[in-house]
A protein has these predicted regions:
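N-terminal accessory regions of S-adenosyl-L-methionine
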Residues: 1-101, 212-226, 231-232, 236-274
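Conserved beta-strand signature within the Rossmann-like core of class I S-adenosyl-L-methionine
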Residues: 193-207
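Class I SAM-dependent methyltransferase SAM/SAH-binding core
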Residues: 109-156
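A short, conserved alpha-helix within the catalytic core of class I
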Residues: 178-192
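A short SAM/SAH-binding and catalytic strip from SAM-dependent methyltransferases
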Residues: 168-182
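Conserved class I S-adenosyl-L-methionine
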Residues: 99-109
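Conserved acidic residues
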Residues: 100, 168, 195
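Short conserved loop adjoining the S-adenosyl-L-methionine
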Residues: 161-165
Length: 274
């Protein structure tokens, strides 16, 4: 572990702090073209910083996300309320042995679970649930060895089988935009008919096409990533015959520009199965 980069900073609880320094640029005809101009998670320095932040957060009981350690926990009230609702509806009628199952696809080192676990601790409550993070090999393997708990487990995207398990909630936080074929993944998720799908920190714009560009991260999180900017109209049309929109909201990252004349906003939404 000596080769890990120790985060030399903490940032306080300021909304949109990460996104203010991020930049979207370019317009690419396909994913491979954008990927060839990006560093992505394959950059060893980025991976090391993510690992180091996760270990610091675990040791010091702090919140972390995207390789950044925060001074204060960043709670997701929409997600935490959803989990409570799902447990009451899906589990309580069947007794304490019924486990609420949550799939966190592309969930990094489990920061969403970390804030949820702290949320439970704040109120001195607990219930029977499992939280599975699915990530690329290098993240999943590290998580299994260093971050996993009784409630939190990690699986590799390469080995993950959508058909193997049924989930009550699927969490997609800052995930879909970084997948080469996001709607193929959504198709597989919807085939399993989870009760709820939680989407957050995802970029949308009002145009009619899904755009591909590059997200250049800030100086604290070096690197760049190919990313989708989804057409909000097309996205809603994809879901509307399969699920019902429960709520949609603006994410903390807020507004952004991805060309001189085009802008978008990071949004979140919760869909439920009737």
């Amino acid at each position: 572990m000596n080769n890990l980069l120790k985060p030399s900073f903490y940032i306080s609880e300021i909304k949109s702090a990460l996104n203010l320094l991020n930049r979207h640029s370019g317009s690419y005809s396909d994913w491979s073209e954008a990927a060839s101009n990006s560093q992505s998670y394959q950059n060893e320095k980025i991976i090391d910083q993510i690992k180091s932040a996760a270990l610091v957060a675990k040791t010091e009981n702090k919140y972390f996300r995207d390789g950044v350690v925060f001074e204060n926990f960043q709670y997701s009230s929409e997600l935490n309320n959803l989990i409570s609702t799902a447990y009451i509806k899906n589990c309580l009628p069947f007794g304490i042995d019924r486990q609420l199952k949550i799939l966190d696809y592309g969930g990094g080192m489990g920061s969403q679970h970390l804030q949820f676990r702290q949320h439970l601790n704040n109120f001195g409550i607990n219930f029977n649930y499992s939280w599975e993070v699915v990530e690329q090999d290098i993240i999943a393997n590290f998580g299994k060895k260093n971050i996993a708990t009784k409630y939190l487990k990690f699986s590799s995207i390469k080995d993950f089988d959508f058909k193997k398990e049924n989930y009550d909630i699927v969490v997609l936080g800052a995930t879909l935009q970084y997948l080469e074929n996001p709607f193929e993944i959504l198709d597989k998720i919807l085939e399993k008919k989870p009760s709820y799908i939680y989407i957050d920190r995802t970029p949308f714009w009002k145009g009619h096409t899904n755009e591909i560009c590059i997200l250049k991260c800030n100086k604290f999180i070096p690197g760049s990533y190919p990313t989708w900017i989804f057409s909000l109209r097309n996205f809603f049309n994809y879901f509307k015959y399969k699920y019902t929109l429960k709520i949609n909201f603006n994410s903390e990252e807020g507004n952004f520009f991805f060309s001189k004349y085009r802008n978008g906003v990071y949004r979140g939404m919760i869909w439920y199965k009737d």
